[in-house]
Amino acid sequence: DIDWWYCNDILLSSSIGCVGGILTCLLSESLILISCKKKKKKSETQQAASTKKGASKLLWRGDIDWCEFTKHRSKADCWLCIAGNVYDVTKWLDRHPGGRQILLNYCGRDATDQFLAFHRQEDHRYLKLYQIGRVAPGTAPEPSKQTVAYRKLRGDLQREGLFDADLKFYIKELLIVLALLGGGIGVIASIGAVSHFTKVTIGAVLLGLGMHQAAFIGHDGLHRGITVKGAGKLFGIRDWGWKINKFLGVFCSSCIFGISSSMWTEEHSLHHSITRRPREDPQFIYLPIWLISLKELHKSVTERVGALARLEKYFMKILVPLQIYTFVPVAVLIGRTNLHIISACYAIKNFKVHDLLCQFLYWLWFVKVILAIPLLRHRVWFVFINHCVIGVLHVQLVLNHFAVECFTAEEEEGKTITRDGRGVMPWDHQQPHPTSTD
């Protein structure tokens, strides 16, 4: 009798891990909600009452001069402008689902385009609770030509339905991912007691390609870009479209790719709102290892003080001149390890249960694959090749952003970034997501 838990059949173990990952995602979406169903109406009522209570204390200020509006840009006094209306979101900072930092970055500024890009139409109803007035006519600066052109382009694309994703495309991509993962696991499972260098290499490459492609699906799912419709009910499931997005996003990014979906969502949303802003975009702060813009030096010298700042400057002098040699090795080999570390730290610090479970399942099946290889040197080779294949994704994403200029918050007004889109993107790189600033 062979206990399934101790079974050495890698295919069986991986299948169990895959099913476990799916169940974990479903549990995080459904079971926890069902267990809280009795408290749901009460908590929603309390939250609505709390929101209205906090909003009712806001003083209506009527027409607000733009110069006066721009003074309210701190944690204790945060105002936003959206479509000419002024909102006091100070009491909303800690309850904002996207995190407080993204709001703080737009205190005292026009956040119209950012709000429209990140929120559904249903979310607009919360705005009126925090409105305190309107920008006085003739006091706000006129939007730049680039901003006007961007808004017109966005409206045209929406009307033409070009933001409506094709779910069939993602089903096809998911099948490709599962085929690559299954092929890689099957090759490793066929090794047996005698390890074969060729099989180890092929298995590592196939698994790496599958994880590489899963990252793209996870990216689009966590962006809620796989099914942009589906806010109603389907088979009794409310907001089914958004649940499909989250399910595929969490499953592909956490259970297959092995990173924290919550950490990625928070950082990546902030990245898209302040793309490549020196020393502020959380996904593109690489000092003291790499310098991506001379503007980073200015912010380091003028805004950073203390022992850590001095230590950073010391290592910058040593490492930055070597970045032409360290870029590829660090991006390919260290980048993925760094993602695993910060994902685990984020999930533990913020006690994200579904993140911890999904990352546990990732390590369960991935370590099982490694242990199926008999020889230690072949295990090391497998991990090295797998990281190299996935590392191509890191190199691609970093270079994709390094190729454009950085703009500070002050410079963003009236500027835009254009990218030469000539040529055909290979299948394995899919489509790059646009990077732009107003």
Feature roles, as predicted:
Residues 156-167, 308-316:
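Cytosolic juxtamembrane amphipathic/interface segments immediately preceding
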Residues 9, 21, 141-145, 149-151, ...:
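Long, hydrophobic alpha-helical transmembrane bundles and adjoining juxtamembrane helices/loops
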Residues 204-350, 408-438:
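Membrane-embedded catalytic scaffold of the fatty acid hydroxylase/desaturase
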Residues 29-38, 225, 395-406, 410:
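Transmembrane-cytosolic junction motif
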Residues 3, 7-25, 167-214, 253-257, ...:
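Alpha-helical bilayer-embedded segments of polytopic membrane proteins, i.e.
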Residues 42, 52, 139-141, 150, ...:
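Polar-ligand-bearing catalytic/cofactor-coordination segments
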Residues 3-163:
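B-type heme-binding environments
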Residues 84, 157, 219, 268-271, ...:
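Divalent metal-coordination and catalytic microenvironments
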